UniProtKB/Swiss-Prot annotation:
Gene of this entry: dinB
The name this protein goes by in its record: DNA polymerase IV
UniProt binding sites for Mg(2+): 18, 116
Family: Belongs to the DNA polymerase type-Y family.
GO annotation, cellular component aspect: cytosol
GO molecular function: damaged DNA binding; DNA-directed DNA polymerase activity; magnesium ion binding
GO biological process, one term: SOS response
Length: 364
């Protein structure tokens, strides 16, 4: 017996665009001498005493098992000839904006998921093109011609399948999943490839003998709900290619933050407070850009031994004032117990966001 109704809208035309090794690809585009060489976006461990982490890397570097969040030291050990580049995030953001403008030629229903990927609903697109595959090919062509980068595209009738499809053939691939092919497509996939299924859920599913989409399809709904609660129903739907989540052109931001990992550990309070100030000003600028105000300020501190502390303070009124954010974040730091270990990461985040309203004085 079904606990929740199964409604499968297969009438939509959804595209998921995922840029190929985006940061590294931008660097290769701007420096052709890098092409064909393993490129890692991250601090060179030879210059930082082995500290730092990999932000991303190109496909050549991935052949050596290098991946994002790996320590730069391990990346170097795996591939001593890798070229490490610190990265220019303002440049990447500018390129990302250029790509989003290309998306907007075809539809206003664009939901950016990050700087290098987005969902597009092209069911009723601006050019009246009936084929979503044709639109995906045009977007790939436009991005290559105007930006000099490649992307992979997934096309299907919902976001879940489109996302899986874009991962299926990279780089510069295009995969279509029709409604009549969805079950076959999902059946062959390892369960860890299912978007939205995290590491702990994968471990639990493996313990239940579920390794593929085909295995998941065979499990009764109530069994999944008993083991996973409401998420069990989501798994039941995913196995059947059902997801009616809309493409939201204006995603509701739940938080705005800025954090930085330091190649050289921070010990001195003056240095720590200076970095808190930089993060606070960055958050204030982002709040201004997104026309948001916030009430809860969160400070994140990660020490040399990777112990991570987060502490928050909720203000009585909304703000986006840099000095106020800096003051509160600094006060939070002062309230933490002293730790002789150096600090490797500091972050400041504003949550409890609301849209800007006219009757609030923002800079007082």
């Amino acid at each position: 017996m079904l606990i929740f109704p199964l409604i499968n809208d297969t009438s939509r035309k959804i595209i998921h665009i995922d840029m190929d090794a985006f940061f590294a690809a931008v660097e290769e585009r701007d420096n052709p001498a890098l092409k064909g060489k393993p490129v890692v976006i991250g601090k060179d461990p030879r210059e930082t005493g082995g500290r730092g982490v990999v932000s991303t890397c190109n496909y050549e570097a991935r052949k050596y098992g290098i991946h994002s969040a790996m320590s730069s030291k391990e990346a170097y050990e795996r591939c001593p000839k890798a070229i490490f580049i610190s990265g220019n995030y303002e440049k990447y953001r500018t390129v990302g904006d250029q790509i989003r403008r290309i998306f907007k030629r075809y539809t206003d229903l664009v939901e950016p998921m990050s700087i290098d990927e987005a969902y597009l609903d092209v069911t009723d697109n601006k050019l009246g093109i009936k084929s979503a595959v044709k639109i995906a090919k045009l977007i790939q062509h436009d991005i290559w011609k105007e930006v000099g980068l490649t992307c992979s595209a997934g096309v299907s009738y919902n976001k879940f399948l489109a996302k899986l499809a874009s991962d299926f053939e990279k780089p510069h691939g295009l995969t279509l999943v029709l409604k009549e092919d969805a079950l076959c497509f999902l059946a062959k996939l390892p369960i860890e490839k299912f978007h939205g299924v995290g590491k702990k859920s994968v471990e639990k599913l493996h313990d239940m003998g579920i390794y593929t989409g085909q295995d998941l399809l065979a499990v009764p709904e109530m069994t999944l709900i008993d083991h996973f609660g409401r998420f069990g129903f989501d798994l039941y739907r995913k196995a059947r290619g059902i997801s009616n989540s809309p493409v939201k052109s204006d995603r509701i931001r739940k938080s705005i933050g800025s954090e930085r990992t330091y190649a050289k550990l921070l010990y001195q309070e003056t240095d720590i407070k200076a970095e808190i100030s930089k993060n606070a000003k960055r958050v204030a600028a982002l709040l201004q850009d997104h026309k948001k105000l916030g009430k809860t300020i969160v400070l994140k501190v990660r020490y040399a031994d990777f112990t991570t502390l987060t502490k928050r303070v909720t203000l009585p009124e909304l703000t986006r004032n840099a000095a106020q954010i800096e003051q509160v974040a600094g006060d939070i730091f002062d309230s933490l117990s002293e730790n002789p270990a150096g600090i490797r990461l500091l972050g400041v985040t504003m949550t409890n966001l609301e849209d800007k309203v006219a009757d609030i004085s923002l800079d007082l």
